[in-house]
């Protein structure tokens, strides 16, 4: 269990009775690839420009399934989710059918990238299907082809001193072809400013990216991002709630890399704090789809491999012209 997960897990179980949180099934001999998506009951509630539409609980291999830290929408109505144990989940949109998802490693040899398999972020070119994966510990970006075969890996110098355990938590290919990587850790303890790197094009090809400072709402940390048109991105935010029992708060903010303030800092604009409007969990993946009936956001949660948490997938209607939270 990596340090960040251990800290979160410890906080979450401290108020629970002993014996209620460990996964009990023994590990299977081989990884179980099939993943089931089961609808859950939801209430149609709105926060800012977002309205919860549907939700599903995902379940699979009793020991290895979980830990999702990133989500992207692939061409052809499919999704790709990545885990911080270096595995992937491919699945069809559950609102278009009930086919099971397929869970497995990014490479057939699970020892690949053993020293730093902590995948925390994904980005995709919707035209070609090429995917980029951001890895903590290594502070690197790996490019995968449309068949999801890993290829070139780069170690950007501007990310070299990012925290090994709170590094490239967000990576997004902006609508204009640029890439934005955001460090999870703030520059100062309990601060709101985060280092980021802006690539003019494919990060594997761009050897001279630009350093950026992003100011996010206080108390929240960035955990994923998705394109929102031109130089804008929606950033998924998480905050640990130290109540009894402890849990997580989820919010979404918007950043525009082309609109820095007078100090050169890109200030995020809060769009929504969800509170109890969505099922409460540790949401770490965010993707967007443009559909015939409008725009939708998709959130996936990280269960931290704890039996009292779930892997949830939520679908939210996004109406960009609706007023954001002031």
What are these regions (language model features)?
Residues 2-326:
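Sequence/structural signature of beta-propeller domains
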